[in-house]
Amino acid sequence: SLSIIINYFDIEKLNKNLFLDFNIPKSRGSVLNYKKRSKKLTIVDESYNSNPLSFKFALEKFDSTYRESDKKFLLVGNMLELGKYSKKLHIKIAKYINKSKVNKVYTFGKLTEHTFNKLKPQIRGKMLNNNKEILNLINKDLPNNSFLMVKGSNSTGLNKIIQNL
């Protein structure tokens, strides 16, 4: 919607306060400061939609937003509705991840097995199989004061897990 405004209206004439109350919709890049007992995590919730292009841009933003010294983790869910290109495109996102500054990568879903197998060995975390393993990752396995980006298609259910934390 911003691109429509930019392309069709004189940007200089727009009210400067127009976007002050704009909030990022849940599961589309929203940031959750999660605390349970003494553990604190910053979770970037990108769990509503995923395709190779949105994945690449979300990962680039995640990389550039946080310092290189920060502990950064990635939870990747299946990208769905890719048809016959699904395997190839899940492999392709491994290339983006391998170039990133992420410390460890965890995957969830059968299709992300293709991604996991193409990751550099030193950043491979674990392939997670169910909601309990995801909650254990968030509540127990990740170090305190770390950053986690969750990216996957809506129907993987990752967004429901994150929203219910």
Feature-to-residue mapping (PLM):
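ATP-dependent carboxylate-amine ligase
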Residues: 2-165
